[in-house]
Curated annotation (Swiss-Prot):
<keyword id="KW-0686">Riboflavin biosynthesis</keyword>
<protein>
    <recommendedName>
        <fullName>6,7-dimethyl-8-ribityllumazine synthase</fullName>
        <ecNumber>2.5.1.78</ecNumber>
    </recommendedName>
</protein>
<dbReference type="GO" id="GO:0000906">
    <property type="term" value="F:6,7-dimethyl-8-ribityllumazine synthase activity"/>
</dbReference>
<feature type="binding site">
    <location>
        <begin position="85"/>
        <end position="86"/>
    </location>
    <ligand>
        <name>(2S)-2-hydroxy-3-oxobutyl phosphate</name>
    </ligand>
</feature>
<comment type="pathway">
    <text>Cofactor biosynthesis; riboflavin biosynthesis; riboflavin from 2-hydroxy-3-oxobutyl phosphate and 5-amino-6-(D-ribitylamino)uracil: step 1/2.</text>
</comment>
<dbReference type="InterPro" id="IPR002180">
    <property type="entry name" value="LS/RS"/>
</dbReference>
<dbReference type="InterPro" id="IPR036467">
    <property type="entry name" value="LS/RS_sf"/>
</dbReference>
<feature type="binding site">
    <location>
        <position position="113"/>
    </location>
    <ligand>
        <name>5-amino-6-(D-ribitylamino)uracil</name>
    </ligand>
</feature>
<feature type="active site" description="Proton donor">
    <location>
        <position position="88"/>
    </location>
</feature>
<comment type="function">
    <text>Catalyzes the formation of 6,7-dimethyl-8-ribityllumazine by condensation of 5-amino-6-(D-ribitylamino)uracil with 3,4-dihydroxy-2-butanone 4-phosphate. This is the penultimate step in the biosynthesis of riboflavin.</text>
</comment>
<feature type="binding site">
    <location>
        <begin position="80"/>
        <end position="82"/>
    </location>
    <ligand>
        <name>5-amino-6-(D-ribitylamino)uracil</name>
    </ligand>
</feature>
<feature type="binding site">
    <location>
        <position position="22"/>
    </location>
    <ligand>
        <name>5-amino-6-(D-ribitylamino)uracil</name>
    </ligand>
</feature>
<dbReference type="GO" id="GO:0009231">
    <property type="term" value="P:riboflavin biosynthetic process"/>
</dbReference>
<dbReference type="Pfam" id="PF00885">
    <property type="entry name" value="DMRL_synthase"/>
</dbReference>
<comment type="similarity">
    <text>Belongs to the DMRL synthase family.</text>
</comment>
<feature type="binding site">
    <location>
        <begin position="56"/>
        <end position="58"/>
    </location>
    <ligand>
        <name>5-amino-6-(D-ribitylamino)uracil</name>
    </ligand>
</feature>
<dbReference type="InterPro" id="IPR034964">
    <property type="entry name" value="LS"/>
</dbReference>
């Protein structure tokens, strides 16, 4: 029986991180968590490309464009959408999630979804290094696991 596990990646990889500036109190912490996880996994700084965009609505397009450059192996999209008093929150959440899912499913490389969608700022901060962990860090770890699985799948040929 052949079993494919998310083992540590055995080849050098380059990672792109697309991070939204909006709610930067949260997104800077998500970014720091992702960068720390990548460094701890042995990814050198020069193999990490950070691209900043205005907000969550810009994440899908820039993530897709970055994935098509051929210079990176995977992308982490980071953002934070905090519910306000209008329906804007709902539309931003739906569209950014759908766009990133499309980029992941139809693009040439894996895309990790690291957009927090919370009812309030406390919930967002808790998931950006607080008691809820750091979702940026978790996305980086997940990306490395997916890259490992994809590497193993390509070796089945």
């Amino acid at each position: 029986m052949t079993e494919i596990l998310g083992l540590p990646i055995t080849r050098p990889v380059k990672v792109g991180i697309v991070v939204a500036d909006f709610n930067d109190l949260v997104t800077t912490r998500l970014l720091a968590g992702a960068q720390q996880a990548l460094r701890q996994a042995g990814i050198p700084e020069e193999n990490i490309l950070v691209v900043q965009v205005p907000g969550a609505m810009e994440l899908p397009r820039v993530t897709r464009r970055l994935s098509e450059t051929g210079v990176i192996d995977g992308v982490i999209a980071l953002g934070a959408v905090v519910q306000g008093e209008t329906d804007h929150y709902t539309y931003v959440c739906q569209q950014s999630a759908a766009g990133l899912a499309q980029a992941s499913l139809t693009g040439p490389i894996p895309v990790m979804f690291g957009v927090l969608m919370t009812a309030n700022m406390d919930q967002a901060l808790n998931r950006a290094g607080g008691k809820g962990g750091n979702k940026g860090r978790e996305c980086a770890q997940a990306l490395l696991q997916v890259l490992s699985v994809e590497q193993q799948l390509s070796e089945l040929r």
